[in-house]
Amino acid sequence: MSVSDVVEIVSQSAVSFTQPSISIQSVPSVTIGSIAFETVGQITTSSTTSTSLDVFDTTLYRSAKYVIQVTDTTNNLYHFCELMVLHNGLIAFVTEYASLYSSYSLMSFDASISGTSLFVTGTPTNPNNTVKIYRVAVGV
């Protein structure tokens, strides 16, 4: 199977796979119903100013959960957390939880709405970081 091949499975009951196994090496996005699972990407920071981490359409998604890993590349420090974002069309609400630090928090997070776009931003504690971001978004 190549990257451009499409496999569609439609079933009214449970589906199981035994042989051959399926290995998915790289999938940027999977949508099941109104839930989208996405690799947002990797961002590099070089200052302590607020940085855009992600943006999504508020007419498509009501909420999102992020898994975020921040690596301070200068001091070899690490920060891993989950972030939940919810909006009512006018205001974005955000909370960080399940946070682990090798020393201290490396980034604070915020969210805002402009028009029909919800922006998630991060403000680094130290200037040189690599940020890896994964998102699960739930439809309106």
Where are these regions (language model features)?
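Short, low-complexity N-terminal tether/leader segments at secretion or assembly junctions of large
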Residues: 1-33
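Short linear motifs in intrinsically disordered
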Residues: 20, 24, 54-59, 107-112
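Surface-exposed ligand/attachment interfaces on beta-rich extracellular proteins
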Residues: 35-63, 71-77, 118, 125
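Extracellular attachment/recognition segments
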Residues: 72-112
